[in-house]
Amino acid sequence: MSLKAIVFDRVLGKCSVKILDQLLLPYQTQYLTINTIDDGYRSIKSMQVRGAPAIAIVGVLSTLMECQLLLQESFVKTQSFYDLTQLEKILNERLDLLLSSRPTAVNLSNAITDLRKLISNDIGKTYNSLFQYACDIIDHDYADNFTMGENGAKHLLAQLEKEAFEGDFGVLTICNTGSLATSGYGTALGVIRSLYERTKKQISGDEQPKRTKTSNAKMVRVFPLETRPYNQGSRLTAYELLHDEIPSTLITDSSISYLVSTSKIPIKAAFVGADRIVKNGDTANKIGTYQLSIVCRHFGIKFYVVAPTTTFDSNTETGDKIVVEERPPNEFRFVQGTLIDGTDPTPVLNESKTPVKAKVGITPLDMPVWNPSFDITPYTHIDGIITEKGVFAKDENGNFHLETAFQ
């Protein structure tokens, strides 16, 4: 099992980039080489790589790798569309292509805006600038994820202490927001990881410094939603939770209310990621997030969005202005996965001993379908937005003030 979504060998002038093909998980681990912007575009568009932070990183790295090829005169001679005297113009056009791969995730848009400021007709200068930016975006994302994890864990435990809650509790999450969606550790799943680290210390009897102990509450189980129709919860989040040995139970998207009402341990919070957060706090995230927020609101469960400030959109006032990507209808009509033996529940292997992929139809081919990739959760349903800069809470009038997130 591998949780390394992006492998970047950062040697100036000799960089290499590989990404984990997440369409093959959880039964097969295979890495794809990224050499050009076209490679980056295809891997993002096809969802071989997904998660707003990871999409941005792969976009940046694919641009870096294409510029690294342009340092080679032999490569330039094979490219009819590349005239190095027009490098800045051509690269901007290439970035337009990259941007079209996933329009809802703002991290990619923000990163491309930064890249446009770094490119010029000087290929050497452009490459060096892109190399430094690529290193920085990966390092900052990784560090920010740990910070968000700690911020979120401390905040929830402090809230539970205010409620005088003690004992075991569970949390909900949707889609995949962990190492596979970022440079490592994760956003919403990073908070869950940090919560469970505290639980393990309490169970083992390890003493915590008084200044960090905020509650006797213990998160003892995670309930990830399967996240139809692409099943990021069942394929990817379940994979990460098993890897980290975090107690968890996978549930169907339609069973949330029944789970909450019958669970033997109280469900105290839901942690979700974000692909775009606008100025009033409205949040675009994986389809199904909005309905999860409605369930949490009904049952009085805290609902938190976890995202780095690179996910904030300073140009959009409210969520109704967000462009929501619609995926191809056949991604809904068909289910793709690893072929399982009908008599023995193990993967069927081909001649090279790798699992066989299969696609199964689940609805009439001529049935019209609606397949939005995201929905918009209104800020009124969100109790807090957890970032690397801290936790944004609402004022007494129920409004967020996110100005510092945009600085």
Curated annotation (Swiss-Prot):
It comes from the Eukaryota. GO terms for cellular component: cytoplasm; nucleus. The keyword Amino-acid biosynthesis applies. GO terms for molecular function: S-methyl-5-thioribose-1-phosphate isomerase activity. Its EC number is 5.3.1.23. The record marks C175 as: Transition state stabilizer. Keywords: Amino-acid biosynthesis, Cytoplasm, Isomerase, Methionine biosynthesis, Nucleus. Pathway: Amino-acid biosynthesis; L-methionine biosynthesis via salvage pathway; L-methionine from S-methyl-5-thio-alpha-D-ribose 1-phosphate: step 1/6. The keyword Transcription does not apply. One of its GO terms (biological process) is L-methionine salvage from methylthioadenosine. It is found in: Cytoplasm; Nucleus. Pfam families: IF-2B. It catalyses: 5-(methylsulfanyl)-alpha-D-ribose 1-phosphate = 5-(methylsulfanyl)-D-ribulose 1-phosphate. Belongs to the eIF-2B alpha/beta/delta subunits family. MtnA subfamily. This is Methylthioribose-1-phosphate isomerase. It comes from Kluyveromyces lactis (strain ATCC 8585 / CBS 2359 / DSM 70799 / NBRC 1267 / NRRL Y-1140 / WM37).
